[in-house]
Amino acid sequence: MDEQMNKKYLANKLFETQFALEDLREIVRQSLPTGMSNDQSEHYDEIVSGLGGLLEDLGKKNGQTQPVKIVGDLMCRTREEEFINIQPIQAGGRLTPEARKAVIAYGDGYSTCDNCRKPFRLDKIEKPSISTFHTDLAEFVGMDQARVVPGARRGFQAVASSIIEKGDTVVVSTFAHYTEFLAVEGAGGIVREAPVNEHNILTAESVAHKIDEVKRETGKLPALIMIDHFDYLFCNEHDIYGIGKVAQEYGIPFLYNGAYTVGIMPVNGQKIGADFVVGSGHKSMASAAPSGVLATTEEWADKIFRTTQMVGDVTGRKFGIKEVEFLGCTLMGAPLLSMMASFPHVKERTKHWDEEVKKSNYFINEFLRIEGNEVLSEFPRKHALSKVDTTGSFDKVAKTHKRKGYFFSDELKKRGIAGEFPGATRSWKMSTYGLSWDQIHYLSNSFIEIADKYDININ
């Protein structure tokens, strides 16, 4: 193991080098097709001559460095380079090298639109192969048609706006995300919550009971069922297949919220019994934000992806190819291209979900060796994201430590670990997703080291 490596130093030097290359790129952009001006050529040569020193610095792997500024007070983000990041909503959205390259190449505004031809719609563009990507996305989640959207929430919004009438009821879980509430409210609907059981699991029976309750009280069935496969509070797995059957039995459309599943584990919407599958690109598909996917069946495609029928009264203009719920096109640049660039890796990693769950359980088992530690999520774990409780261990230390709960953040940071909620020593969430086994072992040992340092018993 190369113990001479300084990750902060390397992160800063990498950014310095990348930014020098970007400065060269800007000179090339500003030059005429016939060549550079004398000033441009001189500046270009000056930057190139400095690259040798930067590469030499990178080769050292250690040394003195300063944080790298982008502009003004905007500094480089080096969390992923410097630390093992266990932040629960960032793990699945960590960009692949291919996605980072795509962001560099396609960061300019409407970069997807260089070759937009008739019929002038994002999902019809063939170069780059955005049209094919939409087909592949639908197949990836076991549905018939798909569209990219600016985050899962816009998928909820599109479905809610399409099928909910004012006063309609929508059944969600008591663990539903706030964006589901807002999507229903925006469409004029009313949320009714199906309660989880004593194990914080939503069952098919609970959903059926809530449907019956709504029917008795309103005389109508709910217009939609919208349920998370794994919730954001505990990341417990809910009876999504059973709920899919209930939806089919009652004839109610079912939206599967795959914000924490699509892109990290296998998902087949039609096998689940879903009419709509929504995923998050920036949460679980290694994509830049905002990005997501909405997929549906042929039965619902015409309604959800309906095109405008509006005609201008003076000009007679109409834009029939544009889809109403997406205001025409959705992701016109880096978010979409990052999603496309990561897609081969994302498809492959879903095949190894069992290994991610093994890593999660290995860490949690080691974590539970620390006396007073608890896991609040269902256990054994079925996901890489977990809610844990350290009230009986690290919070006891925090009560008398001069740094209070921040002592724990300090200890983790010293060991190159980030992403826990700063100052939290009671209940908090974390994710091991995407970590290597070496990182899992290091992470586990670090928690035990901290416990040992503060005389907390280790079993």
From Swiss-Prot:
Catalytic reaction(s) noted: O-phospho-L-seryl-tRNA(Cys) + hydrogen sulfide + H(+) = L-cysteinyl-tRNA(Cys) + phosphate
Cofactor: pyridoxal 5'-phosphate
Keyword terms, alphabetized: Protein biosynthesis, Pyridoxal phosphate, Transferase
Coiled coil (residue ranges): none
SUPFAM superfamilies tied to this protein: PLP-dependent transferases
Pfam families: SepSecS
Single biological process term from Gene Ontology: translation
CDD domains reported in the protein's UniProt record: SepCysS
EC number, as in UniProt: 2.5.1.73
UniProt modified residues of type N6-(pyridoxal phosphate)lysine: K283
GO MF term list: Sep-tRNA:Cys-tRNA synthase activity
Gene3D superfamilies (UniProt xref): Aspartate Aminotransferase, domain 1, Type I PLP-dependent aspartate aminotransferase-like (Major domain)
Record-linked InterPro entries: PyrdxlP-dep_Trfase, PyrdxlP-dep_Trfase_major, PyrdxlP-dep_Trfase_small, Sep_Cys-tRNA_synth_arc, SepSecS/SepCysS
Iron-sulfur recorded as keyword: no
Ligand binding (pyridoxal 5'-phosphate): A152, R153, N257, S280, G281, H282
Quaternary context: Homodimer. Interacts with SepRS.
Function: Converts O-phospho-L-seryl-tRNA(Cys) (Sep-tRNA(Cys)) to L-cysteinyl-tRNA(Cys) (Cys-tRNA(Cys)).
Protein family membership: Belongs to the SepCysS family.
Name used for this protein in its record: O-phospho-L-seryl-tRNA:Cys-tRNA synthase 1
Species the sequence originates in: Methanococcoides burtonii (strain DSM 6242 / NBRC 107633 / OCM 468 / ACE-M)
Lineage: Archaea, Methanobacteriati, Methanobacteriota, Stenosarchaea group, Methanomicrobia
